[in-house]
């Protein structure tokens, strides 16, 4: 049995974090580099645009694999890559389209990707138990899980449970991403598209 940690143990522990600056820090502070982030929102509110911007920022710190189960490599994906200038981070960003067993095999390899974006949770057909197994097998990875929404809530009971478990919960609405999780900066929101946010009354 492992010994219990004291308050001093926890206070003296060093954590690996993303040293966000500017509007990223204002929205999400400096979150840990491992764990689970959960992003959800309704179609047409800027969710895909936010994920692209987030990936571009995270590519400063590590390599990312986007498991694009929903869109694959369709023209819409290519258009978004062009729109957000993702060619500049191409050495750190890769697209795959793999079910969860295949993704696990990839992540077990030496020097596998440390950041994995799963788009979308509904397309994985994972149960909450499946999700816990994935998270526990790879505690040194960061999983960013994208979810459909039903109203203001994640679509499906399993997705809702994952949202509650996630370290960083990001709700996207009216071209603004709101931090609802354990990491919040001074504003707790990130404006994805200024004009869109103004037109939607989100800014």
Task: Kindly give the residue locations of the regions a language model identified.
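Pre-Walker A adenine-sensing motif
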Residues: 15-32
């Amino acid at each position: 049995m492992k010994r219990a940690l004291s308050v001093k143990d926890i206070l003296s522990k060093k954590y690996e974090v993303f040293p966000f600056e500017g509007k990223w820090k204002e929205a999400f502070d400096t979150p840990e580099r491992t764990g689970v982030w959960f992003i959800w929102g309704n179609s047409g509110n800027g969710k895909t645009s936010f994920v692209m911007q987030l990936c571009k920022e995270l590519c400063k710190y590590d390599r990312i694999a986007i498991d694009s189960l929903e869109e694959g490599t369709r023209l819409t994906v290519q258009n978004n890559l062009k729109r957000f200038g993702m060619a500049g981070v191409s050495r750190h960003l890769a697209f795959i389209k793999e079910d969860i067993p295949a993704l696990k095999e990839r992540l077990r390899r030496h020097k596998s990707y440390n950041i994995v974006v799963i788009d979308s949770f509904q397309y994985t057909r994972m149960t909450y138990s499946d999700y816990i197994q994935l998270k526990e097998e790879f505690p040194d990875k960061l999983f960013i899980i994208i979810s459909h929404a039903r109203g203001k809530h994640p679509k499906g009971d399993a997705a809702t449970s994952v949202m509650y478990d996630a370290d960083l919960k990001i709700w996207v609405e009216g071209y603004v991403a709101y931090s609802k999780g354990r990491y919040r900066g001074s504003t707790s929101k990130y404006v994805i598209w200024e004009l869109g946010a103004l037109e939607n009354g989100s800014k």
